[in-house]
């Protein structure tokens, strides 16, 4: 009986949104490790366009240890949560153009759980193994989605997850191509700290948050940060590299590290007010409809998976990306207001990629992007399988502030 509980699936139609077309929703758990009793939770929304032919997007939120449901109800899902805990329709939901599968990963994030504490993931390989087990079970349970083009999207620390999981699928497909992976996308991602930490000072300086002396101070700290990363001493590296962040915040004040156009207030976790989402997802009725264990508590981010994987922070999956570019499309995008994983850092690591079209990509012309005819929404640079986009007016969670531009970007990427 207990084992059946681990794979319970809840199939419902969302009907409590006025003037909304019901969308097929699937949710529940798949057991990915019987030994540790490890269970990944998912929430799936079928495409509102052409579910039988539209691609499948698998979404991963970073942290590490933050729930993908945060994206589902705050960024790019079909519904937002109102202050009175009702739902309102998102006209720019990504399931307007794709089937979207949100997965709470790694184990312990969101509604996902593991009974044996030894089951928490400590490496990207373990996370990828669990995700692969989950995905193969999902596609087996729902075979009508198994042949659709698959795109893996992720945000923030998912800059580690997305390339690692994509490369894991690539390796598995060398034997027999069972998963129809076509591309991957990294939004405001932390991919290579060795490179990206160097952008924190210059970005703040360019936004008027630092003077020239403070900038020079961050440059000296960045050199020490790189040396610490090279040493392999995690504790020392964390302390030294975090000094860059501390110095910038000391000079610039209590700004929102995810959106430099805003102030971060002490009573807001992660600088945002997620109270309505937290309350909604912890309602007994919500948990019942999702097929979630009644005693589960949903949090935006969880400490146990964070503590388990955090020593992997300064490792980088960047060496996987040249191989991935040989086989799949890769999209890297950033909101221009994000500081913590900013576009300068993304531009730098993409420009340094060791792949055959490095020079051609770096020399390719940048295009201006428009929405609504003549409104500038961002900028794009592309060559062969690699595309880099900057979305104007957007933060760390780019689809929230630039929903129209983000949806257009996704549609262009997955529909060729």
From Swiss-Prot:
It is found in: Secreted. One of its GO terms (cellular component) is extracellular region. InterPro entries: AB_hydrolase_fold (IPR029058), Peptidase_S10 (IPR001563), Ser_caboxypep_ser_AS (IPR018202). Keywords: Carboxypeptidase, Glycoprotein, Hydrolase, Protease, Secreted, Signal, Zymogen. One of its GO terms (molecular function) is serine-type carboxypeptidase activity. Glycans are attached at residues 33, 84, 235, 273, 295, 385. Residues 1-20 form the signal peptide. Belongs to the peptidase S10 family. This is Serine carboxypeptidase S10 family member 1. It comes from Dictyostelium discoideum (Social amoeba).
